[in-house]
Amino acid sequence: MAMNSMCIEEQHHLEHYLFPVVYIIVFIVSVPANIGSLCVSFLQAKKENELGIYLFSLSLSDLLYALTLPLWINYTWNKDNWTFSPTLCKGSVFFTYMNFYSSTAFLTCIALDRYLAVVYPLKFSFLRTRRFAFITSLSIWILESFFNSMLLWKDETSVEYCDSDKSNFTLCYDKYPLEKWQINLNLFRTCMGYAIPLITIMICNHKVYRAVRHNQATENSEKRRIIKLLASITLTFVLCFTPFHVMVLIRCVLERDMNVNDKSGWQTFTVYRVTVALTSLNCVADPILYCFVTETGRADMWNILKLCTRKHNRHQGQKRDILSVSTRDAVELEIID
């Protein structure tokens, strides 16, 4: 555990209430939503739909992050005091950033896949196979694990001595000011994990929009639905990830040569923390936008629910039959006696 000599006197009022509320809502909604999305995308992948591979990976990434939220809820409710082991801190930070940047990668793959399907339906068919999607998804998981593995080797906790009610309390990862290795890593992530995916998604969605708008065979109502979906996808990406990365860049510039006792950038750090909470909303938006708004996705989800209901009813029927037999046997035994 690394000891940080900086003394922060911030009272954590905003984070104490905002973060737990946001994280609790995201956890309650995103866990069942992403489990459902995993089921839907698995069914789509079984139907030789390469998009299902990307959706499955996206849902898995969101679910893994959502499962760490109870730890972050506890952390923020305790005024940024990490009460668990340093290993859990490292693991939580790893899955948090793994989700941020694997999500942007898988969203980019989905945008490219839809672009090729609409604009070049025959020309690049070899890029739209399950095999290619599986290899691409596996490569993303490996690369993201490699780039984020640095978080597992660094000391992600530091001790702060400014709360008069406590002898000390432990921070997890979000140190102020940023260390040099964090600045370099953040600049790399912002370029490769945010800027390039955002540009790619916007270009692909614009090309799809133009192709759909000029397609005479598509009904106007269907065109409007597709255009609204494209706009929602782009807007969600921008709202969830842009504020965070803007604040990351600002922090990298302001804190590059900042002394540990310099509190001039603390307001910026507070705004940055709010944008971190905002990124968690992506876990809720992804399954809704990518799995449950399409007719195929809704149909698959409905089939899953019917299957589960049928199994439940069959199980209840079996229990009633067993109970009936048991009661009849008991009556027969009483007669024999």
From Swiss-Prot:
Residues annotated as site: Proton sensing: 12, 16, 245
UniProt-listed PROSITE patterns: G_PROTEIN_RECEP_F1_1, G_PROTEIN_RECEP_F1_2
Residue ranges, Extracellular side: 1-7, 80-84, 156-176, 255-264
Biological process, per Gene Ontology: apoptotic process
Disulfide linkage: 7-162, 89-172
Localization per record: Cell membrane; Early endosome membrane; Late endosome membrane
GO molecular function terms attached to this record: G protein-coupled receptor activity
Ranges per topology, Cytoplasmic: 45-48, 121-128, 215-218, 294-337
PANTHER family, A to Z: G PROTEIN-COUPLED RECEPTOR 65, LYSOPHOSPHATIDIC ACID RECEPTOR 5/SPHINGOSYLPHOSPHORYLCHOLINE RECEPTOR
Annotated family: Belongs to the G-protein coupled receptor 1 family.
Protein name as annotated: G-protein coupled receptor 65
Organism of provenance: Mus musculus
Taxonomic classification: Eukaryota, Metazoa, Chordata, Craniata, Vertebrata
Gene designation per UniProt: Gpr65
